[in-house]
From Swiss-Prot:
Protein role: Involved in the biosynthesis of ADP-glucose, a building block, required in the biosynthesis of maltose-1-phosphate (M1P) and in the elongation reactions to produce linear alpha-1,4-glucans. Catalyzes the reaction between ATP and alpha-D-glucose 1-phosphate (G1P) to produce pyrophosphate and ADP-Glc.
Superkingdom assignment: Bacteria
Similarity annotation: Belongs to the bacterial/plant glucose-1-phosphate adenylyltransferase family.
Protein name, per record: Glucose-1-phosphate adenylyltransferase
Encoding gene per record: glgC
PROSITE patterns, per database record: ADP_GLC_PYROPHOSPH_1 (PS00808), ADP_GLC_PYROPHOSPH_2 (PS00809), ADP_GLC_PYROPHOSPH_3 (PS00810)
Record keyword ATP-binding present: yes
InterPro entries found in the cross-reference section: ADP-Glc_PPase (IPR011831), ADP_Glu_pyroP_CS (IPR005836), GlgC_bac (IPR023049), GlmU/GlgC-like_hexapep (IPR056818), NTP_transferase_dom (IPR005835), Nucleotide-diphossugar_trans (IPR029044), Trimer_LpxA-like_sf (IPR011004)
Species this chain originates from: Mycolicibacterium gilvum (strain PYR-GCK)
Class of enzymatic activity (EC top level): transferase
Pathway: Glycan biosynthesis; glycogen biosynthesis
EC number(s) given by UniProt: 2.7.7.27
Amino acid sequence: MREAPHVLGIVLAGGEGKRLYPLTADRAKPAVPFGGGYRLIDFVLSNLVNARFLRICVLTQYKSHSLDRHISQNWRLSGLAGEYITPVPAQQRLGPRWYTGSADAIYQSMNLIYDEDPDYIVIFGADHVYRMDPEQMVQQHIESGAGATVAGIRVPRSEASAFGCIDADDSGRIRGWVEKPADPPGTPDDPEMTFASMGNYIFTTKVLIDAIRADAEDDDSDHDMGGDIIPRLVADGMASVYDFNNNEVPGATERDHGYWRDVGTLDAFYDAHMDLVSVHPIFNLYNKRWPIRGGAENLAPAKFVNGGSAQESVVGAGSIISAASVRNSVLSSNVAIDDGAIVEGSVIMPGVRIGRGAVVRHAILDKNVVVGPGEMVGVDLDKDRERFTVSAGGVVAVGKGVWI
């Protein structure tokens, strides 16, 4: 039997996430709560761990305390077996400076690669919502002989201009790479679809080391994986695409096969939550064969009293809904909603309190927000714009710990 390749996972988790403000005012983007019981980073870590890639370094930088704590408390593996998920803050090994880009983050962390000496390196982002079996991508990478493999998701050409786009030939070899093009290239088998980069890469170790070193010496580089490293390897004929549509995740439904969402804006973050709440959700959190991990808490079950109800909603542990109505919403843990309150089409994060007779519609309430009795959020957008953040799509976002 062929010995399994030695794979090191590196997760790029230093994103500031300015477009998600106020949710990122006090935390890194990958630490933002999602789905009633998780954080964004839990999706990539679950994919890697479910695929049995159990040596993972998480590179952090921006306001990383809550992210570091979450990983340390909820992602403990067996150190005796050489398994680990470890947060690695910017080490400043090359002087008193932070990472200047994702490729520079790898360059400043090269000691991790040298210490582990892997055959292949999986480099994934930390702020997307999806399920994927990365082992299948690794196998294609090995069989293709490419130096780098980029995960691509098929999107309509009319929507592809927001992404880094991949022009591949029939064999999957990447012959062109364009950031946010006005005229995106079609896929080899469908001219109306485009391969958009998912920000997930697999490298043969020597190829990555050589490319990162060369990039570090280039004063004109922005030191970005997608903007500099991949185009360099494409120019050298060393990069191929992995079609995400071919990834088969155990337990996936027909509706959520191939699901992937970039939640980099408030509207996208909100919409991804609404994908969770229907009877047959677009993204199914309840796939026991490929579970999303990292969200366990020692809390009592949710409770509904005095006729409180929740319809087409996700309700986190420890929450109490008393004589209140919740519809089409995602509630995290330890949420309390008092008599007569109405919550519709909203994302409610841990520890939120919604008072008697209050109304919350089309809103995102960050941790520990308190909505007083009779107060309204998402009902009068002109009033909300004076005190909160309102997205282009009309989603009202209230920052952590605000009292209304």
